[in-house]
From Swiss-Prot:
Organism annotation: Bacillus licheniformis (strain ATCC 14580 / DSM 13 / JCM 2505 / CCUG 7422 / NBRC 12200 / NCIMB 9375 / NCTC 10341 / NRRL NRS-1264 / Gibson 46)
PANTHER family according to UniProt: 50S RIBOSOMAL PROTEIN L31, CHLOROPLASTIC (PTHR33280), LARGE RIBOSOMAL SUBUNIT PROTEIN BL31C (PTHR33280:SF1)
NCBIfam families named among the record's database cross-references: L31, PRK01678.1
UniProt xrefs under HAMAP family: Ribosomal_bL31_2
Identification of the protein by name: Large ribosomal subunit protein bL31B
GO biological process entries: translation
Similarity field: Belongs to the bacterial ribosomal protein bL31 family. Type B subfamily.
Keyword Acyltransferase: no
Keyword RNA-binding: no
InterPro entries: Ribosomal_bL28/bL31-like_sf, Ribosomal_bL31, Ribosomal_bL31_B, Ribosomal_bL31_sf
UniProt GO MF annotations: structural constituent of ribosome
Summary of subunit composition and partner proteins: Part of the 50S ribosomal subunit.
Signal peptide: none
Amino acid sequence: MKPNIHPKTYQVIFQDVNSGYRFLSRSTKTSDETAEWEDGKTYPVIKVEVSSDTHPFYTGRQKFNERGGRVEQFKKRFNMD
């Protein structure tokens, strides 16, 4: 592998702006805003709009398309059973 080609990664806190849920992870992105984590250390905070705490797939509140696909809609429109 070539040396010095990989981006530098940092420990950061990701915070869901909708629920306030926070988790610590690694990222190449950093921020000027910081916060103290449970271990007593200070980390940059990156705010996200959707996380596993609020995404419908993970919360079980997802909606399914009950109208059917394009073929089913076409058949229904032209009475082709």
